[in-house]
Structure formats: C-alpha cells, structure tokens
Amino acid sequence: MDIMKKIELEHLRMDLPKFRSGDTVKVHLRIVEGEKERIQMFQGNVIRIHRGTTGGTFTVRKVSDGVGVERVFPLHSPFIDRVELITEGRVRRSRLYYLRDLRGKAARIKPKNRF
C-alpha cells in the first residue's frame, strides 16, 4: 500500500490556491487541438468540492447567455494550467445546489467580510 501512496503523491499538485464552496474562481485550461495548444478560461462560483488524493474534483457554475453551465474539474489534472481565486464568498453550506433554482440577483453570493 505504501507504493500506491508514493505514486499518488508524485501526481498531486501543490500549486493550487486554497478555495472553498462559494468562492469565485477562474480556471485556466490547457486545450490541445491537433498540434496547437491554447488556454481557455472558465470563471464561475464553486458549488462543490470533493477532496481526496488524486481523485478529488470541484464543480464550477456560471451563467452564460441566460443558461446555467456547470463543469466538473479534477483537482490534480495536468490540463489545468492554473486556478485564480477572484473573490471569497460567504456561504453556510458546502454543497450549493440550491443556486440552480435561483435566478438573477437571488443567485448572487455575498462576499466575505474581511476585517
């Protein structure tokens, strides 16, 4: 079992910022199309984080042209170039699935008060 832990530790990313559910993040994805490589950004609210070793994921939700878009990203994926923390949100839940049913201003997350 120690061999498996060593292999998993080699693939963990240590450059990710500390973020929680409710935070607004910008994920920079590395996309390879043929021989070309480009960076695509996805900005939205983190509605779920599943931590773990190499199998951890986080879900980001944004509204694009009035349509809600959710995307699940592996935490330790080599295709993620970087994750930027834009704002920290103040929420009382870890799973923010209720945002799917809210529209407009009601779907906003209050910013965290920093004193």
Curated annotation (Swiss-Prot):
The keyword Ribonucleoprotein applies. Pfam families: Ribosomal_L19. GO terms for biological process: translation. GO terms for cellular component: cytosolic large ribosomal subunit. GO terms for molecular function: structural constituent of ribosome. InterPro entries: Ribosomal_bL19, Ribosomal_bL19_CS, Ribosomal_bL19_sf, Translation_prot_SH3-like_sf. Keywords: Ribonucleoprotein, Ribosomal protein. The keyword Ribosomal protein applies. NCBIfam families: rplS_bact. PANTHER family: LARGE RIBOSOMAL SUBUNIT PROTEIN BL19M, RIBOSOMAL PROTEIN L19. This protein is located at the 30S-50S ribosomal subunit interface and may play a role in the structure and function of the aminoacyl-tRNA binding site. Belongs to the bacterial ribosomal protein bL19 family. This is Large ribosomal subunit protein bL19.
